[in-house]
């Protein structure tokens, strides 16, 4: 019985720590993407793709435009037509 309780406790700790890592990544992406998309004409679409790229690459270039060399993964993601996926 004690072994089951210990196993449950360890699994709970692991799950809790992984959720906190995911939520902190989401919150940092949200803030960076809000800055990145602040001057975009289609703000919601910009945020959608910026967050997708940020979650995959773990970075967002500074500023509202350009500076993609700061984040090669973000820069190199392409859409189905071969254009830049990330704003």
Swiss-Prot record:
Localization of this protein: Secreted
Pfam family of the protein (one)? GASA
Found, by tissue, as follows: Expressed in roots and developing seeds.
Q: Which InterPro entries match?
A: GASA (IPR003854)
Q: How is it modified after translation?
A: Six disulfide bonds may be present.
> Among its keywords, does the record have Endoplasmic reticulum?
no
Q: Does the keyword Cell membrane apply?
A: no
Query: Which keywords does UniProt give here?
Result: Disulfide bond, Gibberellin signaling pathway, Secreted, Signal
User: Superkingdom of the source?
Assistant: Eukaryota
Signal peptide residues are 1-25
A GO BP entry: gibberellic acid mediated signaling pathway
The record's principal subcellular location, in a coarse class, is: secreted
An example of a Gene Ontology cellular component annotation for this protein is:
extracellular region
What is the stated purpose of this protein?
Answer: Gibberellin-regulated protein that may function in hormonal controlled steps of development such as seed germination, flowering and seed maturation.
- What family does this chain come from, according to its entry? Belongs to the GASA family.
| Protein name in the entry | Gibberellin-regulated protein 8
Species of origin reads Arabidopsis thaliana
What are the top taxonomic ranks of the organism?
A: Eukaryota, Viridiplantae, Streptophyta, Embryophyta, Tracheophyta
